[in-house]
Curated annotation (Swiss-Prot):
This is Trigger factor. It catalyses: [protein]-peptidylproline (omega=180) = [protein]-peptidylproline (omega=0). It is found in: Cytoplasm. GO terms for molecular function: peptidyl-prolyl cis-trans isomerase activity; protein folding chaperone; ribosome binding. It comes from Dehalococcoides mccartyi (strain ATCC BAA-2266 / KCTC 15142 / 195) (Dehalococcoides ethenogenes (strain 195)). Signal peptide: none annotated. The keyword RNA-binding does not apply.
Length: 448
């Protein structure tokens, strides 16, 4: 085996390896012993077919394809181990070049490299947000809608109504959506079963069917719907309208027995909103700091780190989407418009930012020795379990499990690192230092 080509660019090494005929022959023998036990050949018992007959039956090209799994991963690892310059960060990606001669290539991710900028010069301002009466009114309005009841309405359909209806439809003449008693919330932003469907329902009355058509846009995310015409026939069976509760002291007390007046409810909302706004302002402040740290630093990392982070982000987004859309049909319709390629393109910048942020802050933590001591970790476990009562020792044992304790160390490290750089960023702005003139330098020399 010999490495015929090697390149190291950034955090990736690329090698091309040609294997000796003897190595390939040994691999073919191994492959034969593996396959002969599985493949039945007429005239021979399974596992007893002579090798020459077996290879002729299977074909040399097929045998060489099969031998890849038997010898290439091990050969690739050996080539990496023999090269002192290559320190793999993750598993290599291997591709065959040719089978005769037997040549493969591999791309090997290398560890990330971080060179921090002058982070002690970072400065940022923390935003202060005041809660207004209008902000409180908005929250109360949301609470009223959450506590609303739905009452039968004897009038035409309006936006915001909840309907029970019969739907018959075709898509370019083929059956599309057909439901006998479909519940439907009339909302302008709804895209199911077709964009603008809810607007066609406005002013309809119970028992009077209506027929209408909707043309899906040519650039619709679902290729099977793009440009096609959906013909609907809808019959409203029941209309329900939202009835909001009366806003008074009794409503506040019913919402929470701690409140005797509406004013007390409003004060609690103000406090909660202020706390959330302060948290958001802190998060925005820290985002600015981290962005500045990334921008002033030199950070290089292997692509596999972004790919892993991107997969996690997409999985989280899909779970969040599923939790917010209650209707299975609407979830499937929404999901069908989110192609994997589109989602990867949309969330890739976020994945790249998270990787860079993690690497920069991690480097800062080691540079400034911000890794928590055992005593600090123990103190945090004590704080987390102080209200556990009889289960305190059980919970302490849980936090002291290696995996859980490691996660706690990561959390405390991140907390200490952000606190460290927060303190730097809140310091007064640095004053620019004026360069000394030649005349000034001469005067200083004369005074010496």
């Amino acid at each position: 085996m010999k490495v015929t080509d090697k390149k190291i660019e950034g955090c990736q090494a690329s090698i091309t390896v040609e294997m000796d005929p003897a190595e390939v022959e040994a691999g073919l023998s191994k492959t034969y012993r593996r396959l002969v036990k599985k493949v039945e050949i007429p005239g021979f018992r399974k596992g007893k077919t002579p090798r020459d007959v077996f290879e002729k039956y299977l074909g040399r090209e097929k045998m060489l394809d099969e031998v890849v799994d038997d010898i290439v991963p091990e050969a690739c690892q050996q080539a990496i181990n023999d090269d002192e310059e290559i320190k793999p960060f993750a598993a290599p990606k291997i591709a065959m070049v040719t089978t005769e001669p037997f040549v493969f290539s591999a791309r090997i991710p290398l560890p990330p490299v971080v060179e921090l900028g002058d982070y002690k010069t970072i400065r940022a301002a923390k935003e202060k947000v005041e809660i207004t009466e209008e902000n409180i009114d908005t929250v109360i309005d949301q609470v009223l809608h959450q506590r609303a009841t739905w009452e039968k309405a004897e009038r035409p359909v309006k936006m915001g109504d909840m309907l029970l209806m019969k739907v018959e439809s075709t898509l370019n003449g083929e059956p599309y959506l057909n439901r006998e008693d479909m519940q439907y919330s009339v909302r302008e932003e709804a895209i199911y079963p077709a964009p603008g469907f809810g607007e066609h329902l406005v002013d309809m009355v119970v028992g009077e069917p209506k027929e209408f058509s909707i043309v899906f846009p040519e650039d619709h995310a679902r290729a099977e719907l793009a440009g096609k015409t959906a013909a609907f026939k809808v019959t409203i069976q029941e209309i329900r309208e939202e009835k909001l509760p009366e806003l008074n002291d009794a409503f506040a007390h019913e919402l929470n027995p701690e409140f005797n007046t509406l004013a007390e409810l409003r004060q609690r909302i103000r406090e909660n909103m202020q706390e959330r706004q302060d948290d958001q302002a802190q998060a925005k402040f820290e985002d600015q700091i981290v962005e500045a740290l990334i921008k002033m630093s030199k950070i290089d990392y292997p692509e596999v780190m972004v790919e892993t982070e991107l997969d996690q982000i997409i999985e989280q987004q899909l779970q969040r989407l599923q939790s917010t859309i209650k209707s299975p049909e609407e979830f499937r319709a929404t999901l069908s418009q989110l192609s994997p390629a589109d989602m990867q393109q949309r969330y890739r910048p976020l994945a790249e930012q998270r990787v860079a942020s993690s690497l920069a802050l991690g480097k800062l933590a080691t540079t400034e020795n911000l890794i928590p001591s055992d005593e600090e970790v123990d103190a945090e476990i004590e704080r987390l379990t102080q209200d556990s009562g009889d289960k305190k020792e059980e919970e302490k044992a849980f936090y002291n499990k290696p995996d859980t304790r490691d996660r706690l160390i990561q959390l405390l490290t991140a907390r200490k690192t952000m606190a460290f750089i927060d303190e730097i960023a809140l310091q007064p702005a640095l004053e620019a230092v004026e360069p000394k003139s030649d005349e000034g330098e001469k005067t200083e020399e004369a005074d010496k």
